[in-house]
């Protein structure tokens, strides 16, 4: 029942102000940002469920530990493939779970939620994300494209009439965009990103060293000694895997110079995509970018030497955002404030 709008009511409304939440719905992980608290949750986008009963067994980190280790009736899946919803019902349940987990149980008023999607998604896919978010308990939903979220999170003032180029390298996709006046002017999304770096290392180790390694090991190599550009001093690490000839465990020493060779093809494709976006950029905005530089975000941007490589191939100053992993989540959360400010 509608109460009379007295002072007490105004006070009550103040204390019941709803929460603003930003969700970075990534192929590899999901991050939840809450206004005033920052990023409160970061978990793998994995769901494990029982085939026979269709009941969900685990979500997030708990489910990731089950990947490749489950008995026949339990399957662990990643419902988002290359930034696209491949399984709608599972995604909806996953969203619900993470929203509740991030907020805790005390929700007086439904939250306003903004969700970030890769720039290449179709209207149908956007609608699916929107529906899933409403189903998960949102009062209002705003869908934001990844490059814009990344730009806000990287601290760029996107409302100005000035060209900024953002390159967001995630797990499944790399989004490249030129942004001005709060919108995307030119953009492209390629399905070459962090996951492909790992796969390239696996292929290289097999070809060059006859060594079979798993995804976790490949990611380890990428993080510790992965390189996109020749550096003055090469670093190395010992890798354990299975020798393909003898079938027995073996240790091989790998150097950063080798990882550069392994990753050449994938990094070249990212540079190529940056080129094609620059070629389509209107001259005034291109001049802004030459002046202000290219900003990298996303987990994939942490690859050593990537800035130097892009700089050498484009001739444009390139820098990585302060906290590239969480830039998209933070930007998604702040986007709601940006929208509210425009009303």
Map each language-model feature to its residues.
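Nucleotide/phosphate-binding catalytic cleft detector across ATP-hydrolyzing
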Residues: 9-169, 177-295, 301-343
């Amino acid at each position: 029942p509608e109460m009379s709008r007295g002072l007490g009511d105004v006070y009550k409304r103040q204390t019941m102000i709803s929460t603003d939440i930003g969700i970075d719905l990534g192929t590899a992980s999901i991050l939840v940002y809450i206004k005033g608290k920052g990023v409160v949750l970061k978990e793998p986008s994995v769901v494990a469920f029982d085939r026979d009963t269709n009941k969900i067994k685990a979500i997030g980190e708990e489910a990731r530990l089950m990947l490749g280790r489950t008995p026949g009736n339990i399957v662990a899946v990643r419902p988002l493939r290359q930034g696209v919803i491949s399984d709608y019902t599972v995604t909806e349940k996953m969203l619900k779970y993470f929203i509740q987990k991030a907020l805790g149980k005390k929700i007086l008023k439904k939250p306003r939620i903004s969700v970030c999607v890769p720039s290449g998604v179709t209207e149908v896919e956007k609608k699916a994300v929107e529906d899933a978010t409403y189903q998960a308990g949102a009062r209002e939903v705003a869908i934001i494209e990844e490059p814009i979220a990344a730009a806000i999170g990287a601290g760029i003032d996107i409302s100005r009439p000035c060209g900024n180029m953002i390159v967001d390298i995630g797990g499944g996709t790399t989004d490249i965009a030129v942004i001005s006046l709060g919108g995307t002017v030119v953009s492209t999304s390629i399905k070459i990103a962090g996951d492909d770096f790992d796969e390239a290392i696996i292929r290289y180790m097999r070809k060059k060293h006859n060594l079979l390694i798993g995804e976790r090991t490949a990611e380890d190599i990428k993080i510790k000694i992965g390189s996109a550009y020749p550096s003055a001093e090469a670093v190395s690490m010992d890798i354990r895997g299975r020798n393909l000839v003898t079938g027995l465990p073996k240790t091989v020493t790998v150097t950063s110079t080798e990882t550069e060779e392994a990753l050449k093809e994938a990094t070249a494709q990212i540079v190529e995509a940056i080129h094609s976006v620059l070629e389509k950029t209107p001259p005034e905005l291109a001049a802004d970018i030459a002046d202000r530089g290219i900003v990298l975000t996303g987990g994939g941007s942490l690859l050593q030497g990537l800035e130097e490589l892009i700089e050498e191939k484009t001739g444009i100053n390139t820098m990585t955002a302060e906290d590239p992993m969480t830039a998209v989540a933070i930007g998604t959360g702040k986007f709601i404030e940006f929208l509210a400010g425009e009303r």
